[in-house]
């Protein structure tokens, strides 16, 4: 087929259908008057519970309308972790999650369709509250972080200021019938269910809130859900009526007296402290200097510096196997220039560019780290290759132009903004911007400067997808890797692009089982 300028084609193949089909699964104690699947769909934003949906009707098991979700648009639960131990943590920053510190066992989290696994490098436990905000090894690309409330506890407890509370979790599964009897469904951590909580929260000490839900669960909500064992760390979202937004209010800590849900609050002061500890001092480029920032790094000590004239900025990267030793760097100043003199292994440290920058190297130095954030209206010309087995994670609304030389053996995972692949050929004519490209979250666009930048079969669309702008280039796909209907092919060029889908099975791809020469029936 072909695609002309401005055309966007949704990409979905049978290879991806399995990711869309529901499986038998559920979370916590829920009311038995409603279909069990309703609670699952609610927690997974499936069916009528798409994020942003309004005035959602709720029907009981008899198909009778029992009410509407009309206090707020449907919350987006995508910031809640999935796959292993789903619901135990929520993304609150591109590199940090929130949960309870008594959750000691989990070491990694996944989001969206669970394609990527993010490893915890620092647990960041609160000194007194049942709360921790672990740091991850990479910037998350599949989803956007939840907004953590900055409201006072008094405001959170005021129903006129917080008109709705929704929860999700994967604790031990029970259904309570209309007579109050609980029926066991399955153990915890299998899948998410969720529901609506009343607005009658009250104080739990100085760092938490609690909610009474004793008696029959049906008395508390038209879609009731009560946390159980295994729900620890699961999120409580509240609708801020003044700001018109959902906010993460707290994380589930436990149950008091068998009737009270207890949530730990997330102090903004604690978050600021944690984030600050992981940042090096901002780096400022002085355009009047006439020289680039010279970036040196000593992998044996995990330390380095960026120097321009008499100005020098210290930086910290991975030290031995300690990824958390890597600190984040933010670059300020217009039309900045950075020259890598050594390969930099920044560990869990990320790079944030607030303005236009060019990053280059004259000796083939490479960079690895948590990823790159390019702020809105900024453009970064990235002329540095990665390494095999590592992926460059890119987020931020700005543009990253990849313009290195030769074959880059590293991969790309992009979750926001624009990435232009314009890798240049080396002296032997070899060119590859990335070994693989993953487009996720529904926010990003990847633009191809030509059809040599990446093997089309190594391009994939993750959770909620994004746009692959073929930019007038002809491409042949032997397979399409799309997690859902968010995958899009676009063409911003005036030139028509021909897209060939060649699914013909090659003889080498066919596996043949042969009988052994003994003729005794053994394969």
Regions found by a protein language model. Give the residues of each.
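Glycine-centered positions in the ABC transporter ATPase nucleotide-binding domain
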Residues: 95, 398, 417-419, 442-444, ...
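Catalytic histidine site
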Residues: 60-116
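Acidic Gly/Asp/Thr-rich repetitive segments characteristic of extracellular carbohydrate-active
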Residues: 292-330, 415-418, 427-439
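C-terminal subregion of chymotrypsin/trypsin-like serine protease catalytic domains
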Residues: 28-62, 87-103, 192-221, 225-294
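Chymotrypsin/trypsin-fold serine protease catalytic domain
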Residues: 135-226
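Gram-negative bacterial Sec-dependent N-terminal signal peptides
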Residues: 1-26
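Extracellular, surface-exposed repeat architectures
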Residues: 325-404, 446-523
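Conserved H-D interstitial segment of serine endopeptidase catalytic domains
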Residues: 104-144
């Amino acid at each position: 087929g072909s695609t002309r300028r401005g055309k966007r084609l949704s990409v979905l193949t049978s290879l991806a259908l399995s990711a869309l089909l529901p499986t038998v699964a559920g979370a916590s104690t829920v009311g038995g008057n409603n279909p069990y699947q309703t609670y699952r769909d609610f927690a997974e934003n499936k069916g009528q519970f798409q994020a942003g949906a309004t005035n959602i009707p709720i029907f009981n098991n008899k198909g009778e309308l029992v009410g509407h979700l009309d206090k707020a648009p449907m919350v987006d639960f995508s910031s809640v972790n999935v796959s292993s131990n789903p619901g135990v943590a929520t993304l609150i920053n591109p590199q940090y999650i929130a949960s309870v510190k008594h959750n000691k066992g989990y070491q990694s989290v996944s989001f969206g369709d669970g394609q990527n696994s993010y490893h915890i490098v620092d647990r960041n436990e609160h000194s007194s509250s049942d709360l921790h905000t672990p740091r991850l090894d990479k910037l998350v690309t599949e989803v956007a972080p939840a907004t953590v409330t900055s409201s006072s506890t008094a405001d959170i407890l005021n129903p006129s200021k917080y008109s709705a509370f929704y929860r999700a979790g994967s604790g031990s599964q029970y259904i309570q019938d209309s007579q109050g009897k609980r029926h066991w469904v399955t153990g915890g951590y299998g899948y998410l269910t969720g529901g609506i909580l009343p607005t009658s929260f009250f104080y739990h000490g100085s760092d938490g809130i609690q909610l009474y839900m004793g008696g029959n669960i049906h008395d508390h909500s038209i879609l009731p859900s009560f946390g159980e064992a295994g729900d620890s760390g699961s999120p409580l979202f509240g609708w801020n009526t003044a700001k018109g937004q959902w906010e993460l209010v707290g994380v589930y800590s436990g149950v008091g007296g068998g009737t009270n849900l207890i949530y730990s609050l997330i102090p903004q002061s604690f978050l600021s402290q944690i984030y600050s500890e992981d940042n090096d001092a901002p780096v400022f480029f002085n355009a009047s200097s006439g020289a680039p920032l010279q970036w040196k790094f000593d992998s044996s000590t995990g330390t380095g510096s960026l120097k321009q004239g008499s100005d020098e900025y210290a930086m910290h990267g991975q030290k031995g196997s300690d990824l958390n030793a890597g600190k984040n760097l933010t670059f300020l100043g217009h039309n900045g220039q950075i020259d890598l003199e050594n390969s930099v292994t920044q560990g869990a440290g990320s790079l944030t560019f607030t303005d236009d920058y060019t990053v280059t190297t004259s000796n083939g130095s490479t960079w690895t780290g948590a990823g790159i954030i390019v702020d809105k209206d900024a453009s970064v010309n990235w002329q540095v290759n990665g390494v095999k087995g590592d992926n460059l994670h890119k987020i931020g609304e700005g543009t990253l132009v990849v313009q290195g030389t030769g074959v880059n053996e590293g991969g790309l995972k992009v979750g926001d903004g624009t990435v232009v692949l314009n890798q240049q050929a080396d002296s032997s004519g070899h060119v590859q911007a990335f070994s693989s490209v993953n487009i996720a979250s529904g926010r990003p666009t990847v633009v191809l400067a030509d059809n040599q930048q990446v093997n089309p079969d190594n391009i994939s669309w993750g959770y909620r997808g994004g746009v692959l702008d073929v930019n007038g280039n002809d491409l042949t796909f032997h397979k399409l890797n799309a997690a859902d209907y968010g995958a899009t092919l676009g063409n911003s060029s005036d030139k028509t692009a021909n897209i060939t889908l060649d699914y013909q099975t090659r003889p080498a791809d066919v596996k043949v089982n042969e009988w052994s020469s003994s003729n005794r029936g053994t394969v």
